[in-house]
Design a protein with these regions (language model features):
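Short regulatory alpha-helical coupling segments
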Residues: 90-91, 104-124, 155-164, 182
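A short pre-motif secondary-structure segment
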Residues: 168-171
Length: 258
């Protein structure tokens, strides 16, 4: 875009220098120069600069009382801090405060979205319901602070490289996280669940008094079904079976039953 002679006079600076003050990222984000003065309405652009700053640019059309076009006024505002606060609030609204996993509300919204995608032809997805074995014993023996450490430890495993980028782990209730595995068959989901189970079994957690604690978990596995209630019920049934057949194992749901 150009810089007017009036702008030079107002700020006492050569127009070439004025134009050079505008970051390249901003120039790249704006419409081509030939379009700027044919645009009939006000417009807003948001640009992320290389140094991490976010700038909002408002283009305001200036007209006379009779409606004649006088030009455009460009207003630039640093909104970096505002966007940072918004991201923080969004994270708090969707994250479990103890574990850092996705909270139930956000997780269920993602599950519903995945169900819709599958209904419209997307590949199948798998669903895991996890439950720490004898977790009450951990709380009773070492205290709730250590119990919280165990939950955080499991959450860290889930957030680590054991899951793929497209997978989502959430805390649905108490010591029962769940994992949504998009574009995943039940067979592939079983392999992922086993990898998670073994990783937890082979790890240790330090109690508040310095003792090393080992815990295991049971996993109920099912395909994502046509509605969330059926998906949760199916994975819960498989989890219940895993608990009642020795714990520390992965059980697939029998979805052939009516």
């Amino acid at each position: 875009f150009g810089v007017s002679t009036l702008s030079e006079e107002l700020v006492g600076c050569d127009r070439t220098k004025l134009r050079a003050m505008v970051p390249t990222e901003v120039l790249d984000a704006l419409p081509p120069a030939e379009q700027l003065y044919t645009m009939g309405n006000n417009a807003t652009y948001e640009v992320a600069l290389a140094q991490g700053t976010t700038v909002r640019i408002d283009m305001v059309q200036i007209r006379t009382a009779r409606g004649n076009d006088l030009g455009r006024l460009w207003l630039a505002q640093d909104i970096t801090e505002r966007r940072r606060r918004e991201r923080t609030l969004e994270r708090l609204a969707t994250t479990d405060t103890l574990t850092g996993l996705t909270n139930r509300r956000a997780f269920m919204a993602r599950l519903e979205a995945e169900i819709t995608h599958i209904a419209h032809g997307a590949p199948p997805a798998a669903f895991l319901m996890l439950d720490l074995d004898h977790f009450k014993r951990v709380n009773d023996t070492w205290g709730h602070a250590t119990g919280d450490k165990v939950l955080v430890h499991l959450a860290n495993l889930l957030r680590g490289n054991l899951l793929r980028k497209q997978d989502m782990a959430g805390r649905l209730r108490g010591e029962e996280p769940a994992v949504l595995l998009p574009n995943t068959t039940v067979e592939q989901g079983h392999a992922i669940a086993e990898r998670l189970r073994i990783a937890l079994e082979q790890s240790t957690i330090a109690s508040d008094d310095g003792q090393s604690i080992r815990v295991t978990m049971s996993v109920g596995l099912c395909p994502v079904l046509p509605d969330s209630a059926s998906t949760l019920a199916s994975s819960d049934a498989a989890l219940y079976q895993a608990k009642n057949t020795g714990r520390n194992r992965v059980v697939r749901a029998d979805t052939t039953k009516a």
